[in-house]
């Protein structure tokens, strides 16, 4: 059991201080189901002040906070994009605590009152949205509270789902924010997250759909292979190159295909790297049908989860039962959360890309406006997971290298500043000596009569003061 302290601020300057603890079994890795979860305790303390900020007076009942981009998405690959939400509500003063057993969801929502609202705020609170996003944020949060209460309660009580939300907070305002959110989903995917997504995104449509921005246009059928037999896809294939770093560049992507009832069935597996240097394996089953008019197009539709649809376009292929066999796929997809994601992958029989087929691939990639040289090389060694001690040592070494690098960068900056200062002082000193030389030359060139006139013009400050009757401040002459 581990307790983590947290503190959040509500709309009316109420402060929630809470501790969340979870007891997890040690024999499983990121596989928290209801049967695995023993218990969790949330202790919440609310402190209230009398003054209510003007910003929240317009919505006295429900105040929803999101980050500057509004509602965030988190995904478990290109098909499973899901929402993370934060909810602020005005909560009365008091202390409340609760223990979550297996039937936590029913218990929480039967007693939907002070604790339930407090727990949601404690887990899902984010920064307040900008004024432009405030209306949409309020609609989303209101929809969740009204339509997805049960699913929300289950997410709160599930360690993986709660960890997913916490992970998302590290993505705010990053240049790779979307990619970061999707990686969070990859790490913490489970059935509870899926159930919440199904309600919030698909069934009740609380989450606005991300629009297609045209990054992956549909290719013209003329640039695709004109003949393709789905049976050629049968057997095991490795993905050795991928275009999209978010979806296509996982380690150990070994996919096995077979045909049944005029469909191509793919058993897909890949590895997700964990922050400690380990990994765990994900898997999925996908089914494709061939376009009756264009053999180079395969459709993966009619999926229940988020109603996702993937369209595969075969740019080039060579299947001759040799190590140089390959199938080059470009794809575009859509689901209830995101319309227009896409990418491209190269399937090869070999775990490593044969160099001899690269010219063909470069030509094929150019047909859809892509440069094959920019594709990412994947790691298909598929070795065992390193021992925990080795992984920890590696992380320590990485940390040491990071610190050394930062120190070296600081030293370089200090050296640059010092060099600039030395150069500046050197120039000032040279200028001062030049002025001295000018003065000496000037005095040397004066005649005796000119020197006498110059001496006669010299007046003491006290004499000037008397002359002007103390009307001038003497400090300006001294």
UniProtKB/Swiss-Prot annotation:
One Gene Ontology term, aspect cellular component: chloroplast thylakoid membrane
Enzyme Commission number, as recorded: 1.23.5.1
Membrane topology: Peripheral membrane protein
Reaction equation(s) it catalyzes: all-trans-violaxanthin + 2 L-ascorbate = all-trans-zeaxanthin + 2 L-dehydroascorbate + 2 H2O
Main location: plastid
PROSITE patterns in the cross-refs: LIPOCALIN (PS00213)
Domain of life according to the entry: Eukaryota
Signal peptide (from-to): none
Oxidoreductase is among the record's keywords: yes
Entry keywords, A to Z: Chloroplast, Coiled coil, Membrane, Oxidoreductase, Plastid, Thylakoid, Transit peptide
CDD domains with a match to the protein in the record: lipocalin_VDE
Pfam hit, one: VDE
Localization: Plastid, Chloroplast thylakoid membrane
GO process terms (BP): chlorophyll metabolic process; xanthophyll cycle
Function: Part of the xanthophyll (or violaxanthin) cycle for controlling the concentration of zeaxanthin in chloroplasts. Catalyzes the two-step mono de-epoxidation reaction. Stereospecific for all-trans xanthophylls. Zeaxanthin induces the dissipation of excitation energy in the chlorophyll of the light-harvesting protein complex of photosystem II.
Listed name of the protein: Violaxanthin de-epoxidase, chloroplastic
């Amino acid at each position: 059991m581990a307790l983590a302290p947290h503190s959040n601020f509500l709309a009316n300057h109420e402060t929630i201080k809470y501790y969340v603890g979870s007891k997890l079994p040690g024999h499983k890795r990121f596989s928290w189901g209801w049967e695995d979860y023993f218990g969790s305790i949330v202790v919440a303390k609310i402190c209230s002040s009398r003054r209510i900020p003007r910003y929240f007076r317009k919505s006295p009942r429900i105040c929803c906070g999101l980050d500057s981009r509004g509602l965030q998405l988190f995904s478990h690959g290109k098909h499973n994009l899901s929402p993370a939400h934060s909810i602020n509500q005005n909560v009365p003063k008091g202390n409340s605590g609760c223990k979550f057993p297996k039937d936590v969801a029913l218990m929480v929502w039967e007693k939907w009152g002070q604790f339930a609202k407090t727990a949601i705020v404690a887990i899902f609170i984010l920064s307040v949205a900008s004024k432009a996003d405030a209306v949409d944020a309020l609609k989303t949060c209101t929809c969740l509270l009204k339509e997805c209460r049960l699913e929300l309660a289950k997410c709160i009580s599930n360690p993986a789902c709660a960890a997913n939300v916490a992970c998302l907070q590290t993505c705010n305002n990053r240049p790779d924010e979307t990619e970061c959110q999707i990686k969070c989903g990859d790490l913490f995917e489970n059935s509870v997250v899926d159930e919440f997504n199904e309600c919030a995104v698909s069934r009740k449509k609380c989450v606005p759909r991300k629009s297609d921005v045209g990054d992956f246009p549909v290719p013209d059928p003329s640039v695709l292979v004109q003949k393709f037999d789905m049976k050629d896809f049968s057997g095991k294939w490795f993905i050795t190159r991928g275009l999209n770093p978010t979806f296509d560049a996982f380690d150990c992507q070994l996919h096995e295909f077979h045909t049944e009832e005029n469909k191509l069935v793919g058993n897909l597996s890949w590895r997700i790297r964990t922050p400690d240097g380990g990994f765990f394996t994900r898997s999925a089953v996908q089914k494709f049908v061939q376009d009756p008019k264009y053999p180079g197009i395969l459709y993966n539709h009619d999926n229940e989860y988020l109603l996702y649809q993937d369209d595969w376009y075969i740019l080039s292929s060579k299947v001759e039962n040799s190590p140089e066999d390959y199938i080059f796929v470009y794809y575009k997809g859509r689901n209830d959360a995101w319309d227009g994601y896409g990418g491209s992958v190269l399937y090869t029989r070999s775990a490593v890309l044969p160099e001899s087929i690269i010219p063909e691939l470069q030509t094929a990639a150019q047909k859809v406006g892509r440069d094959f040289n920019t594709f990412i090389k994947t790691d298909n060694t598929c070795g065992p997971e390193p021992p925990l001690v080795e992984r920890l040592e590696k992380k320590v070494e990485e940390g040491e290298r990071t610190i050394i690098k930062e120190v070296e960068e600081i030293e370089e900056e200090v050296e640059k500043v010092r060099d600039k200062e030395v150069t500046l002082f050197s120039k000032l000193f040279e200028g001062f000596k030049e002025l001295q030389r000018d003065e000496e030359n000037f005095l040397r060139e004066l005649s005796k009569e000119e020197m006498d006139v110059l001496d006669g013009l010299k007046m003491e400050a006290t004499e000037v003061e008397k002359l002007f009757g103390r009307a001038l401040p003497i400090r300006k002459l001294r």
